[in-house]
Amino acid sequence: ALTEVVRRYPNTRYAADARIKIDLVNDHLAGKEMQIGRYYQRAGRWLAAATRFRTVVETYQTTSHTPEALFRLVESSLQLGMPEEALKYAAVLGANYPGSKWYEKAYRLMQKHAPGVAVK
C-alpha cells in the first residue's frame, strides 16, 4: 500500500511520508533477519545463519544492518571452511564501509583465521 502511494503520487508529502515508513519497515525486517541469523550462529548452524545474513545484504542493502550482515557472512564463511568466500564479503565490507567497526573486526578475523587470503 505504501509503495502504491509512492508510485501514484510521487511528488506529494504523502509519498515522502510513505518512503520514510517503507525505510523503517525494511530496517525492522532486516533487524529480524539479523536476530534470527545470530540465533543460528549461536546454535552452530552456520549455513542457516549465512542464508539469513545474505538476505539482509541482498534484499535490505540500504538498511543500517548491512555492515554487520557482511561481517557475519565473513564469520560464517570461515566457519564453513570457505576463506575465499569470506574474503569476498570482507572486500565488499571494506569497499563500502571502510571505517566501520565491522570492517575492523572482519580484517582481524581474516588475518587470524585465513592469513593466506587476508584482506589488504
Where are the language model's segments positioned?
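Acidic, polar-rich low-complexity tracts and alpha-helical solenoid repeat scaffolds
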Residues: A1-K120
